[in-house]
Amino acid sequence: MFTDTINKCAANAARIARLSANNPLGFWVSSAMAGAYVGLGIILIFTLGNLLDPSVRPLVMGATFGIALTLVIIAGSELFTGHTMFLTLGVKAGAISHGQMWAILPQTWLGNLVGSVFVALLYSWGGGSLLPVDTSLVHTVALAKTSAPAMALFFKGALCNWLVCLAIWMAIRTEGAAKFIAIWWCLLAFIASGYEHSVANMTLFALSWFGHHNEAFTLSGIGHNLLWVTLGNTLSGAVFMGLGYWYATPKAERPQPAAHTASETTR
């Protein structure tokens, strides 16, 4: 039932491992691209949200954030939150090793951070209409996120990446316009529900940092948010989606671990 999709995810995990080993610069550039693409989506939805009544703001922001994951998937790039699912399935299928997975994930996260901050810098240098006023939506939301309780961030992060990985999973299983519909619905649910995405937050925090933010908005608060949200994102991507669909597949239908060693996947 899910064998073909798992095979595609495992093959992508092997591709990610090869790219990381054989072309580290290319891997980091591709990771930075993913952070930038998500950042472009964040700038769009906060530009719109800043103009809207709070009663309709979550719906409109959610309905327009699909551009972020559409760019990541269709243009192609390396997104940390998607990698949590891909690499877990790659390990279970024997396409990569545990060591490769845990070496790649932090590199992807850092590459995403580079791209996220770069886009925020460009926006700031370009005038950044959202940034000069400390009551702007960018600043109020960023401050609220950095002062939220750890467990709230963790579980909102888990719910968020469950939806993001579902969007990616369904995009793999569908063709044509159905891919875009799957992405759109899942990201609408994620944004409108107020969940937490580590890479999306990177751009939001950078935007606020480069603007006229409240004094209570601090680097320690940013670190607090990104730590717990990243852990929550990893839980749902690796466990709910990766292990979930692996064990939802009958044992006889699961891909058999490849005979090659992990080192061979990087050739």
Regions flagged by a language model, labelled:
Residues 1-267:
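Alpha-helical transmembrane segments and their helix-helix packing motifs
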